[in-house]
Swiss-Prot record:
Residue runs in coiled coils: none
Note: Present with 1870 molecules/cell in log phase SD medium.
Native organism: Saccharomyces cerevisiae (strain ATCC 204508 / S288c) (Baker's yeast)
GO-annotated molecular function: snRNA binding
Protein name according to UniProt: Pre-mRNA-splicing factor BRR1
Pfam families: SIP1
Quaternary structure and interacting proteins, as annotated: Interacts with HTA1 and associates with the spliceosome.
Record-linked Gene3D superfamilies: 1.20.58.1070
Length: 341
């Protein structure tokens, strides 16, 4: 290109060409190469514009690092009736629970061993229970025969009649007697006094134990260790709380056990255990909000031992459910109030 010649700016790219492609002095191979570069640039630019337009069409919401907080703020503007009910009653419910907990931990029976007189009465009760069974297997007949050889104290029958013993106790003792070789009264006494030393392992064993036994304060000193308590809380959170809320076959017994588990949960716990409790609280809250509580439906009842301790349910508490009590206790006593806010 001659020194005096100039090039008009490119209509698309807005730049002046470095030299005229029509100039005869330019190598034809260079011209072809530059044309291919131009076509590639045009194609790339067109794709970029198209993608940008598509992205604009798809974009409905621009993400923010504060999205979670924004959603939380929106939720707070629409509080469910079940959450309002919790907020209004939580302090009253937890205050009542704390008084019940103090009563159980202070006054409930805690087994420390049998006196001779008490053991004789238990043997007599067991003998009468076995004799009243409509059908008896060979093992039961043998146990009765062994017990008949024992010399019971005078007036033992009268005292035995006044002794309040749950037949469930006799059933459990019989199960263990059937697994033991019984040749003398001492063998029977040993089964009674040593208690059930079998350590429960896994979901099925614990489930069978809970549905077949009334919860008692002493159980948390004999059978349920501090470590096993947290295993039970996990089982409650994962499965049993659903059974309770939907009023399944064993919901009454499981409800009673949940009440006792809450009573025996330590007041000070580690961050790990707080997280386990929080999971249970969240599960309860989720169930409550899915199926709002109606008046007189699923209202809490007192386990047998609590009733015997003269624990009362005041009017302000009588329509509360165990799921509501659970989330309330976790929220207030374990610093998880955000669950109900």
């Amino acid at each position: 290109m001659k020194r005096g010649e100039s090039q008009a700016p490119d209509a698309i790219f807005g730049q002046s060409r470095a030299f005229a492609l029509s100039d005869s002095s330019v190598n034809p191979d260079v011209i072809e190469y530059l044309k291919s570069v131009r076509q590639e640039a045009l194609r790339t630019n067109a794709i970029s514009i198209k993608n940008h337009m598509n992205l604009q069409k798809r974009t409905r919401h621009k993400s923010s690092m504060y999205d979670d907080e924004d959603e939380g703020a929106l939720k707070r503007h629409a509080i469910s009736p079940s959450l309002i009910r919790l907020q209004r009653n939580v302090e009253i419910w937890v205050r009542w629970f704390n008084s019940v907990k103090a009563t159980v931990l202070t006054n409930a029976y805690e087994f420390t061993g049998y006196e001779d007189e008490t053991l004789d009465l238990l043997l007599l009760f067991l003998k009468n229970y076995l004799e009243d069974m409509p059908s008896k297997c060979t093992t039961v007949e043998k146990i009765i025969s062994v017990l008949n050889q024992h010399s019971f104290p005078e007036k033992a029958e009268e005292k035995e009649e006044n002794l309040q013993i749950d037949e469930e106790w006799a059933k459990n003792i019989l199960v263990r007697l059937e697994k033991t070789k019984i040749d003398s009264v001492e063998d029977v006494k040993k089964v009674i006094t040593e208690g059930d030393k079998h350590e429960l392992v896994g979901y099925n064993q614990w489930f069978q134990y809970l549905i077949n036994n009334e919860p008692q304060h002493t159980t948390f000193h004999e059978k349920i260790t501090s470590k096993q308590l947290w295993v039970l809380i996990k089982y409650m959170s994962n499965t049993w709380i659903k059974e309770i809320h939907k009023k399944g076959r064993h919901y009454r017994r499981l409800q009673d056990w949940l009440f006792y588990i809450l009573v025996h949960t330590p007041e000070r716990v580690t961050a790990e255990y707080t997280s386990i409790l929080r999971d249970l609280g969240k599960k309860c809250l989720e169930l409550i909000q899915k199926k709002p509580v109606e008046a007189h439906e699923n209202k809490i009842t007192l386990p047998k031992e609590m009733a015997e301790l003269n624990v009362e349910i005041p009017a302000a508490v009588e329509n509360m459910t165990i799921t509501e009590l659970t989330v309330s206790v976790i929220a207030v006593n374990y610093g998880q109030k955000d669950l109900i806010e």
